[in-house]
């Protein structure tokens, strides 16, 4: 057990940090879920992708609903969710947000919660909602 701490420290320090932001959410989704972010989640249900309205269609869509609300809370606090950058590490299936200013850390935390939620809901992912027309959301 004693030897694991130095090993863990070495590995944590040797994994390169990845630049974040809205564009890198794609990378985080793909690393954690193994799915193409744009084609699988860019237009999924009523909340995945831009905007959102109505009742989420399933667990995956609820993940996006929660993510939208997480982003909304950050915008209320003055964070620019579309261009704000942050750093995170990804190793052995684990996303770790790097320390930094409030907006950076919390934006990363919103994205981290989303990708783990999407991963938990992979089994219930429904291709029927992959390109769901928002007009049907109420």
UniProtKB/Swiss-Prot annotation:
Its EC number is 3.1.1.4. Optimum pH is 6.5. Activity remains high up to pH 9.0. It is found in: Secreted; Cell membrane; Cytoplasmic vesicle, Phagosome; Recycling endosome. Its cofactor is Ca(2+). Gene3D superfamilies: Phospholipase A2 domain. It is linked to Fleck retina, familial benign: An autosomal recessive condition associated with a distinctive retinal appearance and no apparent visual or electrophysiologic deficits. Affected individuals are asymptomatic, but fundus examination reveals a striking pattern of diffuse, yellow-white, fleck-like lesions extending to the far periphery of the retina but sparing the foveal region. This is Phospholipase A2 group V. The gene is PLA2G5.
């Amino acid at each position: 057990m004693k030897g694991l701490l130095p090993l863990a420290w070495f590995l944590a320090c040797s994994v390169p940090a990845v630049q974040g932001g809205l564009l890198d959410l794609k990378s985080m989704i793909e690393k954690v879920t193994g799915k193409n972010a744009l084609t699988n989640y860019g237009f999924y249900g009523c909340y995945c992708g831009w905007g959102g309205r109505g009742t989420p269609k399933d667990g995956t869509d609820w993940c996006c609903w929660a993510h939208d609300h997480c982003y909304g809370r950050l915008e209320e606090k003055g964070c620019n969710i579309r261009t704000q950058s942050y750093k995170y590490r990804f190793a052995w299936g684990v996303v770790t947000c790097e320390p930094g200013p409030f907006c950076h850390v919390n934006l990363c935390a919103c994205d981290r919660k989303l990708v783990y939620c999407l991963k938990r809901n992979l089994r219930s992912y429904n291709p029927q909602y992959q390109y769901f027309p928002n007009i049907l959301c109420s």
